[in-house]
């Protein structure tokens, strides 16, 4: 009777990326270009260079895309083309500072705004390759790997933006990240550095971290907040052991 079942359009997602161990990773999140904080970004880059990182993971929301969001644009807001140009310049600067590093760029909820805008306002353009974010930001030419709708895994650690796990905001977000992931993970999205450690039933250490942001600390839409600038340096050994410096920029 199985042949009576109608066709299913379910598709298993295969968008996660697994990278090898034995590496040191600089994690930068939530730059929100063109509202990025230059001093905070430079501090993260400096620490990455002094730590001899060989990998950079951009943990999402590198772009803000305020101009194409569902929210009203502020007077004098930069055009979408200007936002893209500034994003290109930031990515070029990161690549220049880490010429030999592997660089990965995870899609955040602000990057999702581009697809949402096209689907709502010009759905017939949705499949045009020149309108894909990786093409607009020239990621291929800069040898930056785009990770759309997926996680990055390295050893026992997983890297995500954070919007994928709803309900992790508020008090103790790193612990909430653990309750959602059930494993070691690092996310951004919440703009507040925090860490949580526990052990599983076999005694294995599990650690979850929320990294700070690298954007405008007092945006017009949320001028009084408890956000903090920050980044992380993660070492993953050959054996898969993970050491995390979740740094706050004061």
Residue positions per predicted region:
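Short hydrophobic beta-strand that contains or immediately precedes a catalytic carboxylate
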Residues: 27-29, 186-187
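Short, well-ordered, mixed-charge alpha-helical segments that flank or form enzyme active sites
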Residues: 66, 112-116, 154, 166-168, ...
């Amino acid at each position: 009777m199985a042949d009576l079942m109608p066709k299913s359009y379910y598709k298993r997602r295969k968008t996660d990326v697994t990278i090898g161990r034995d590496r040191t990773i600089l994690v930068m999140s939530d730059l929100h270009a063109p509202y990025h904080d230059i001093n905070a970004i430079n501090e993260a880059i400096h620490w990455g260079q002094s730590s001899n990182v060989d990998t950079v993971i951009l943990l999402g929301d590198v772009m803000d895309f305020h101009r194409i969001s569902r929210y009203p644009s502020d007077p004098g807001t930069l055009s979408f083309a200007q936002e893209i140009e500034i994003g290109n310049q930031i990515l070029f600067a990161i690549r220049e500072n880490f010429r030999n590093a592997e660089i990965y760029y995870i899609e955040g909820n602000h990057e999702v705004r581009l697809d949402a805008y096209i689907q709502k306002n010009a759905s017939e353009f949705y499949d045009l390759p020149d309108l894909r974010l990786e093409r607009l930001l020239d990621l291929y030419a800069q040898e930056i790997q785009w990770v759309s709708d997926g996680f990055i895994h390295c050893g026992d650690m997983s890297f995500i933006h954070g919007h994928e796990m709803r309900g992790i905001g508020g008090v103790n977000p790193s612990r909430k990240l653990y309750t959602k992931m059930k494993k070691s993970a690092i996310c951004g999205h919440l703009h507040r550095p925090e860490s949580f450690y526990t052990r599983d039933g076999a005694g294995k250490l599990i650690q979850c971290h929320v990294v700070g942001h690298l954007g405008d600390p007092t945006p017009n839409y949320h001028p009084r907040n408890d956000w903090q600038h920050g980044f992380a340096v993660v070492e993953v050994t050959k054996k898969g052991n993970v050491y995390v410096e979740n740094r706050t920029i004061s």
